[in-house]
Regions:
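Membrane-interface extramembranous regions
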Residues: 1-120
Length: 120
């Protein structure tokens, strides 16, 4: 049970960022318009989506997990700053803060030396 919870947390975070990365890369819905409204240059959704996919992949191996958490933490910090700066509604802020909180929890566990089993 001790290894199962961290493994499930890493898998869940990886899935969240795979989906987010795919949505950002696809530019579906209002993605491109949102990035433009937040002041990012054209095509930044591709950069962000690509980095989210890289971060998700890094979470899947115990040897790269720290770097995945660091990369995704920076991405989420930037996302939260953009959302706050543009006074986005709570319905956009709440998921961002929840995901950032899960990333922080995972990072604390990794830095404390928790043995996160590699996903297989």
């Amino acid at each position: 049970m001790r290894v199962l919870i961290p493994t499930v947390l890493m898998a869940a975070l990886a899935v969240v960022f795979i989906v987010a990365g795919a949505i950002n890369i696809s530019g579906r819905g209002t993605v491109k318009a949102d990035f433009a409204r937040w002041g990012f240059p054209d095509g930044f959704n591709l950069v962000c989506g690509g980095l989210e996919l890289v971060g998700a992949a890094l979470l899947l191996s115990a040897s790269t997990r720290f770097w995945g958490l660091a990369l995704l933490g920076v991405i989420m910090a930037g996302a939260i700053v953009a959302l706050l700066r543009h006074r986005e509604p709570v319905s956009h802020l709440a998921p961002a803060f929840a995901i950032a909180g899960l990333l922080a929890l995972a990072a604390i566990a990794v830095s404390a030396g928790s043995s996160f089993a590699a996903l297989s």
